[in-house]
Amino acid sequence: MGGTFDPVHNGHLVAASEVAALFDLDEVVFVPSGQPWQKVHRVVSDPEDRYLMTFLATAENPQFTVSRVEIDRGGATYTIDTLRDLRGARPDDELFFITGADALAQIFTWRDHRELFELAHFVGVSRPGYQLALDAALPANSVSLLEVPALAISSSDIRQRVGRGAPIWYLTPDGVVRYIAKRHLYQSRA
């Protein structure tokens, strides 16, 4: 599951759990982005903070792991590089790339997008009632859409809530709430 995870929240965890159950996955690997090329217009928290929050959020689920592949690579991060790395490390595994359906709708803007579908099956998750018109050019055998239980949670809302001093309990796992407070993350972003 790729994402900025700034911060990771319960919606991410529910989506990962739902996809794992539907596709009978042995493991879901969370891959916090290093320097996401598509988010250069906004401040993104330090990759180490995002990695540690994701680690804390997933630690209780034995099916979840967190990879540093994008963080350790350095520089702008692209999904194609991550999938090539994962394919090299796991040549016999069937890879699924879990992302938001809104991000999946933009996949033709991603670097080397044609090769992406050779490396992994893409799962776009959306909330109930969210209408998504996917490009007809997407290969049907390499892309699935999955509606997950609606959780009105977003990373941007969590950052804004912290910035204005509002509580974030139950929006993100307790360990992440404590980590954000300890590191004073998002407090200057109202």
Curated annotation (Swiss-Prot):
Sorted UniProt keywords: ATP-binding, NAD, Nucleotide-binding, Nucleotidyltransferase, Pyridine nucleotide biosynthesis, Transferase
EC number: 2.7.7.18
Enzymatic reactions: nicotinate beta-D-ribonucleotide + ATP + H(+) = deamido-NAD(+) + diphosphate
Transmembrane segments: none
A GO BP entry: NAD biosynthetic process
Gene3D superfamilies registered for this protein in UniProt: HUPs (3.40.50.620)
Nucleotide-binding recorded as keyword: yes
Free-text function comment from the UniProt entry: Catalyzes the reversible adenylation of nicotinate mononucleotide (NaMN) to nicotinic acid adenine dinucleotide (NaAD).
Entry's family note: Belongs to the NadD family.
PANTHER family the UniProt entry points to: NICOTINATE-NUCLEOTIDE ADENYLYLTRANSFERASE-RELATED, PHOSPHOPANTETHEINE ADENYLYLTRANSFERASE
Record-given protein name: Probable nicotinate-nucleotide adenylyltransferase
Naturally occurring in which organism (per UniProt): Frankia alni (strain DSM 45986 / CECT 9034 / ACN14a)
